[in-house]
Amino acid sequence: MKIYKLQTPVNTILENIAADKSISHRFAIFSLLTQGENKARNYLLAQDTLNTLEIIKNLGAKIEQKDSCVKIIPPKEILSPNCILDCGNSGTAMRLMIGFLAGISGFFVLSGDKFLNNRPMRRISKPLTQIGARIYGRNEANLAPLCIEGQNLKAFNYKSEISSAQVKTAMILSAFRADNICTFSEISLSRNHSENMLKAMKAPMRVSNDGLNLEISPLKKPLKAQNIIIPNDPSSAFYFALAAIILPKSQIILKNILLNPTRIEAYKILQKMGAKLEMTITQNDFETIGEIRVESSKLNGIEVKDNIAWLIDEAPALAIAFALAKGKSNLVNAKELRVKESDRIAVMVENLKLCGVEAKEFDDGFEIEGGCELKSSKIKSYGDHRIAMSFAILGLLCGIEIDDSDCIKTSFPNFIEILSNLGARIDY
């Protein structure tokens, strides 16, 4: 895919940003804990979340879908499927399903694409094995394909060494099948969509005021079925917020965006860098929702070292902002970027250099010199949707060719359509 430099300003309202991926995954998986119909409007119709629907269908759920409206009726009993459960590119789907299936009678095989099957799963499989789960896979159950033989699980008191919503949610799901009350704690607050959704579903779970400590009781009855409207994804919206900032004389208003405090840290970083960016809350339901107004802005360099778990998905796009800021910027304490869909630290630095930007990597982050003269280049996405979308936005300024753009469909199927509607010329 080749993106040409955009010659005209952008002034628009975007209401069709992709639905939130985290909430879509959880809606589908948590529906298996209920009885009766679960309904979601604005479900994300991307490869990752469609794979999750296929997984729960193979476990016995009945699914009706009309456009982005999805209805799920869970089975009375989870089936042991006669096929591999394909998670595609989604680490969220695989890690949550490991936790869900560990305590269910049956034999299950989880696999994914070549990228997912090389991402670390021991952070889930190890604590589950310690409470009685039987999980088998390469490198001591660190790499998929993973085979899970459901077992009776023992209660646990687990302190996570990493701040990860995927680890947290997997342990919550396993706790629902344990033989007694379980506790979970983490070093810093990760995304809390699971807690918010499970609270609305009347799950037997208590959360401390700071959100760091959970007490989960085994399920004695099905949870309350869901009927929700899924807001738009702030991580997906971030690319177009960035576009408004870097394009001269431009303004974009992003509508119906999830404004959960654990999801808007990257926007706050842009504000600290000098961006003209306002967030307005319009609705408070099980999640906070609102709109984001962004205008062309001059950015200043910044050091980012806190709340990294809250901006891990936006880090590649933030690196683009760093490259266009005045002065030096760096991001540290972000070693988790090494084990995402690609090694995002190495890949961002490599590709920015190809575009004429001075950049260097650390073990846990990168440093970028802003204000370098940009040059048109061909970059590699390494199959990482967020790398591809980040450089697509940079391409609006200097022109860029991206070697693998199909990966964008895993999370944001209408990204290219929106980019084209802004006036971008795109060749395939």
Swiss-Prot record:
Active-site residues from the entry: D313
Pfam families, per the entry: EPSP_synthase
Locations listed in the record: Cytoplasm
Annotated GO CC locations: cytoplasm
Pathway(s) served: Metabolic intermediate biosynthesis; chorismate biosynthesis; chorismate from D-erythrose 4-phosphate and phosphoenolpyruvate: step 6/7
Catalytic activity: 3-phosphoshikimate + phosphoenolpyruvate = 5-O-(1-carboxyvinyl)-3-phosphoshikimate + phosphate
GO aspect biological process, one term: chorismate biosynthetic process
Recorded GO MF terms: 3-phosphoshikimate 1-carboxyvinyltransferase activity
EC numbers, comma separated: 2.5.1.19
First-tier enzyme category under EC: transferase
PROSITE patterns documented for this protein: EPSP_SYNTHASE_1, EPSP_SYNTHASE_2
SUPFAM superfamilies: EPT/RTPC-like (SSF55205)
Binding of 3-phosphoshikimate, residues: K21, S22, R26, S164, Q166, D313, K340
Residues involved in phosphoenolpyruvate binding: K21, G91, R119, Q166, R344, R386
UniProt keywords, alphabetically: Amino-acid biosynthesis, Aromatic amino acid biosynthesis, Cytoplasm, Transferase
Family recorded in the similarity comment: Belongs to the EPSP synthase family.
Purpose of the protein: Catalyzes the transfer of the enolpyruvyl moiety of phosphoenolpyruvate (PEP) to the 5-hydroxyl of shikimate-3-phosphate (S3P) to produce enolpyruvyl shikimate-3-phosphate and inorganic phosphate.
Self-association state and partner proteins as the record states: Monomer.
Identification of the protein by name: 3-phosphoshikimate 1-carboxyvinyltransferase
Organism of provenance: Campylobacter jejuni subsp. doylei (strain ATCC BAA-1458 / RM4099 / 269.97)
Gene: aroA
